[in-house]
């Protein structure tokens, strides 16, 4: 996926708050929603009553969840449980049949993916999304050209991101020459160039050597210390449970359980249906 397409043609990053911007889309006729809006805390990304069917088969039914700024939340479950569909409905890649997605209490359900990105919902796909024909600094700079019109501030922000993610030494390197861990750091740094309030990470441990797992975990923790809310879906359960604050376990298209990692692992139902009786953190 070309990440610039998430912002739309000739798009610029919104400088007002997500709530104010969502409201402006409503005024322009691009935003629709129910007359009744439930109370939702500022600084949250939430889904309510999501449902999705394919060919008459209901794969997601009445799933609700929330992520607050500064916390990491896992979206986990067995293959075919519906977790990926839920995740893609939140990103905007899949349209929900029922339910809604709210950012800071404002309905963003009808918005395409690029508008959600402009409001502050970042997305890092499972497959490599790096621009292979560009250098590291040009990868990050491509997004900064959209989000920061001032050339001097753009250069300063580029230097800061390279330093923050410890990739200054490869700034001139072609992206195709990076290791798996370096590539992930570049992708996350580039995602942060869009100044998201929330990051949705799809299989962040996929294609990563075991030695780099701790590096990715540290990067996710770094995002939360920045005040960014993180939603992760991944098949590497142990690694994911080792870094999140809470998790939602999806089974047969519904939320089987929500809780902290210790509560999840201790649940007889979760162990029986998903983790197995011998699972340990």
Swiss-Prot record:
Gene Ontology MF annotations: ATP binding; ATP hydrolysis activity
Binding-site positions, ATP: 77-84
GO cellular component: ATP-binding cassette (ABC) transporter complex
Protein name: Probable ABC transporter ATP-binding protein AZC_3926
Family: Belongs to the ABC transporter superfamily.
Recorded superkingdom: Bacteria
Keyword ATP-binding: yes
Region (Disordered): 1-38
Domain ABC transporter intervals: 45-277
Pfam family, one: ABC_tran
SMART domains, sorted: AAA
Family annotation (CDD domains): ABC_YhbG
Matching Gene3D superfamilies: P-loop containing nucleotide triphosphate hydrolases (3.40.50.300)
Paired cysteines (S-S): none
Alphabetized InterPro entries for the sequence: AAA+_ATPase, ABC_AA/LPS_Transport, ABC_transporter-like_ATP-bd, ABC_transporter-like_CS, LPS_export_LptB, P-loop_NTPase
Alphabetical UniProt keywords: ATP-binding, Nucleotide-binding, Transport
GO biological process, one term: transmembrane transport
């Amino acid at each position: 996926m070309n990440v610039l397409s998430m912002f739309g043609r000739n798009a610029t990053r919104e400088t007002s708050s997500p709530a104010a911007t969502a409201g402006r889309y409503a005024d322009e006729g691009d935003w629709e929603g129910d007359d009744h809006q439930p109370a939702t805390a500022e600084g949250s990304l939430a889904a309510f009553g999501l449902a999705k069917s394919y060919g008459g088969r209901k794969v997601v039914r009445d799933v609700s969840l929330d992520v607050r700024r500064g916390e990491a939340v896992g979206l986990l479950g067995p293959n075919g449980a519906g977790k990926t569909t839920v995740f893609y409905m939140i990103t905007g890649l899949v349209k929900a049949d029922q339910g809604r997605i709210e950012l800071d209490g404002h309905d963003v359900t009808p918005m395409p993916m690029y508008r959600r990105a402009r409001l502050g919902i970042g997305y890092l796909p499972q497959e490599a999304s790096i621009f292979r024909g560009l250098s590291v600094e040009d990868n990050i700079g491509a997004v900064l050209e959209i989000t920061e019109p001032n050339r001097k501030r753009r250069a300063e922000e580029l230097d800061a991101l390279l330093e923050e993610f410890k990739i200054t030494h490869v700034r001139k390197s072609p992206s195709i020459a990076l290791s798996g861990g370096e590539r992930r750091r570049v992708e996350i740094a580039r995602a942060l160039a869009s100044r998201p309030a929330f990051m949705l990470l799809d299989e962040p441990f996929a294609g990563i050597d075991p030695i780099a797992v701790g590096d990715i975990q540290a990067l996710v923790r770094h995002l939360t210390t920045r005040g960014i809310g993180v939603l992760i879906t991944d098949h590497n359960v142990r690694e994911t449970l080792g870094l999140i604050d809470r998790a939602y376990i999806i089974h047969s298209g519904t939320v089987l359980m929500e809780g902290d990692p210790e509560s999840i692992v201790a649940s007889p139902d979760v162990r029986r249906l998903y983790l197995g009786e011998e699972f340990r953190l």
